[in-house]
Amino acid sequence: MCEVVEVQGVTSEETIETIMEFSKRLGKVAVRCDDNVGYVVDRLRIPYLFEAMRLHERGHGSMFDIDVAMKLGANYKLGPFELCDHIGLDNVKNMMDGWRKAEPDNPLYAPVATLDRLVSEGKLGKKTGAGFFKYKSKREGWSKR
């Protein structure tokens, strides 16, 4: 899947059609979207990840249980904490910080203490061997903390 971003008044229909066709030749499913923060996928995914972190911070579930619930209950391949560790906690934090700067009054982008702490400690996820979960190596799965 790839997001084909259309900038209103700038991107021609011919350009969009060319990119859509090229994506199809690559075996990708292309979706059109306008130029907004996060486009479609990250605009939906990142607030979901933040809410999972807040849910855990409020004591409503362990990281492990929240991950299992979303994998089994929503048929997601990765739970939110696994996904954050896969993306890189520094990358997730950078997205949050950028979106908060763009939309400072939006509560979806309020800081998450646990994320801020882990990033400040250098625990960035799989790439450093620790994030929300600990990893024996970059290729192995997570272990319950």
Regions found by a protein language model. Give the residues of each.
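NAD(P)-dependent Rossmann-like dehydrogenase/reductase catalytic/cofactor-binding core
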Residues: 10-35, 39, 47, 53-145
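Short, charged, surface-exposed secondary-structure boundary motifs
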Residues: 1-3, 18
